[in-house]
Amino acid sequence: EFRRVLFRSFYKTEYASLETAQSLGMTEKDLNKATDALLDYLQDRRDNINVTVAVKGTETKAFNARESSHMVDVRTLYHFAMVLRNVAIILLVASLVYMAVRLKGGMLTIFSINYMKTAILAAVFFAMLAGWAYVDFDAFWTTFHKLAFRNDLWLLNPDTDLMINLFPAEFFSTMVFRIVGMFATGFIGLFVLCYLFLRHQLHKLHGELHHE
């Protein structure tokens, strides 16, 4: 439920910033109605995205057949991402339990060293991606879609498809960099903790050697 609130809060903020409702000739109520249908569909809270909204005073289906087909692919990708996230969490917990049992006292030291090595490599990789997205987001986003989808249903027409007007490049650019920022904050925070722990251990070891 918290994730739903977070998603909707972000969408509403971006809609206000981009003046989406005004540019499309929709009320905020209908704009949120269409968005809720998409988000609920992604999270398996509904079976389709069939909703009716008023666009420039005319009642119409919010999304056509092509958009509905594309959302099937998007939901599949979303579910795959959630599976990867859950597997990563399970592997992390399993690794920590293994180290706790086998390495005991040295667990935190080994974990900190390995995490810092991995974090540095990951930081370089994601910094390159972020740099690419910052310099040419359109090329970055197009490449992502070509890699993520096996068809061209993601190529929507702004003259006929509401979805691409709801979520223009500026919308996704903000979303991508916000996600990167959230992950970076977590990575950097844990990196600093690992660094401080290792420095403490080195000072402790140095003190013991000096005492001897």
Question: Where are the regions that the model predicts?
Answer:
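Short, small-residue-biased leader/transition segments that mark boundaries at the very start
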Residues: 1-6
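Alpha-helical transmembrane segments of integral membrane proteins, especially early/N-terminal helices
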Residues: 36-56, 140-148
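Hydrophobic alpha-helical transmembrane segments
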Residues: 22-35, 57-68, 117-136
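Juxtamembrane non-transmembrane "cap" segments at the membrane-aqueous interface
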Residues: 134-159
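Short, membrane-exposed interhelical loops at transmembrane-helix boundaries
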Residues: 150-174
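Alpha-helical transmembrane signal-anchor/signal-peptide segments
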Residues: 7-24, 145-146
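Juxtamembrane interface at the cytosolic side of transmembrane helices
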Residues: 89-137, 189-212
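Individual transmembrane alpha-helix segments
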Residues: 44-88, 169-182
